[in-house]
């Protein structure tokens, strides 16, 4: 019998102090010396779907709240549902067991095709300012909001999840950019003390949603 092994394309210079195996992924729960933030967390093991349909809102339900307006986001502790345009939305799950993808042609799983990162904590927008001309922390951005554009010169989907005392963003991009993206983020965040953090730190941040 062939064992299935799923590997995140994200690699940090430090190894996790606690980890677990889950659905053939090795999930980092905690890193040594996570500090006071800001943090970067690898979420590549989290289930992600792309949804495309000419009548997108017909697929909405209590468990899949697709926003009516483009650029808006339905954000909770369980998921982020991002309205991209008239016919397309992205679904990013945060839970360990989100359930099966609907058996409908409109849904495509993108988990292993993309990078999924969370950047959050104090000074996180000072870090992002060094990596993009998009004004993610500016007054015209009302969380939760989807922003699509270049981040470290890479096309990304970015959700500005929160500002205030617990600011942060979520972002996805093509899997092939993982190494360069992580290197650029940590390099930009070095002066602010940015460090890798595990899934448990991310869960604490998600409690505000």
Show the residue positions of the predicted features.
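Basic, glycine/lysine-rich polyanion-binding surfaces/domains
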Residues: 1-209
